[in-house]
Swiss-Prot record:
This is C->U-editing enzyme APOBEC-1. One of its GO terms (cellular component) is apolipoprotein B mRNA editing enzyme complex. The gene is Apobec1. GO terms for biological process: chromosomal 5-methylcytosine DNA demethylation pathway; cytidine to uridine editing; establishment of localization in cell; lipoprotein biosynthetic process; lipoprotein metabolic process; lipoprotein transport; mRNA modification; mRNA processing. Disulfide bonds: none annotated. It holds the Pfam family APOBEC4_like.
């Protein structure tokens, strides 16, 4: 719903919208912000109505907070089919992936889709294996693209009046680099993306190093998208 006065003031499906600057700093794929932000929506039983909410790290990771809270909500029905979509600023760590996998095994009627802005410590084998385990358990994991950023802006952000169509358009290259690395994780290949951060001055460097196995198993169109083929 387009609005010249910003988002609808009273949205019964959304508990809290985040501010534009929060969305920009949390979901910028170039930033290595420590905190994690979760935007999520829940659809029960194939209904058209969707329940939306936002969450950030507390003493636990946002994924664990969600799982603990989800099963205690009054609307939770363990025998009703439920579709959950997460938009995460960081991918789940290995421990969170294990908690999610265990949760899904206990609740077979739940389907989970995860869109991520960045890969969390992607060279850590525990995190890489955790993502593969999630996919093996039926979770769909994708890097956020322009479509997801635009969707989140319209549905989760307290955007300024007449700015419904605006969202922080990040360079496509960073998105493509994460897409390439996620593909390596899924295939069980060594990391090809390296991220270096200097404190003085504060700069972040993204580099790609490909081995023979990468050229052999990664589809050419993914390499072309990053200018590597």
């Amino acid at each position: 719903m387009s609005s010249e006065t910003g988002p609808v003031a009273v949205d019964p499906t959304l508990r809290r919208r985040i501010e534009p600057h929060e969305f920009e700093v949390f979901f910028d794929p170039r930033e290595l912000r420590k905190e994690t932000c979760l935007l999520y929506e829940i659809n029960w039983g194939g209904r058209h109505s969707v329940w939306r909410h936002t969450s950030q790290n507390t003493s636990n990771h946002v994924e664990v907070n969600f799982l603990e809270k989800f099963t205690t909500e009054r609307y939770f029905r363990p025998n009703t089919r439920c579709s959950i979509t997460w938009f995460l600023s960081w991918s789940p760590c290995g421990e969170c992936s294990r908690a999610i996998t265990e949760f899904l095994s206990r609740h077979p009627y739940v389907t989970l889709f995860i869109y991520i802005a960045r890969l969390y410590h992607h060279t850590d084998q525990r995190n890489r294996q955790g993502l593969r385990d999630l996919i093996s358990s039926g979770v769909t994991i994708q890097i956020m693209t322009e479509q997801e950023y635009c969707y989140c802006w319209r549905n989760f952000v307290n955007y300024p009046p007449s700015n419904e169509a605006y969202w922080p358009r990040y360079p496509h290259l960073w998105v493509k680099l994460y897409v390439l690395e996620l593909y390596c994780i899924i295939l069980g290949l060594p990391p090809c993306l390296k991220i270096l951060r200097r404190k003085q001055p504060q700069l972040t460097f993204f580099t790609i190093t490909l081995q023979t196995c990468h050229y052999q198993r990664i589809p050419p169109h993914l390499l072309w998208a990053t200018g590597l083929k």
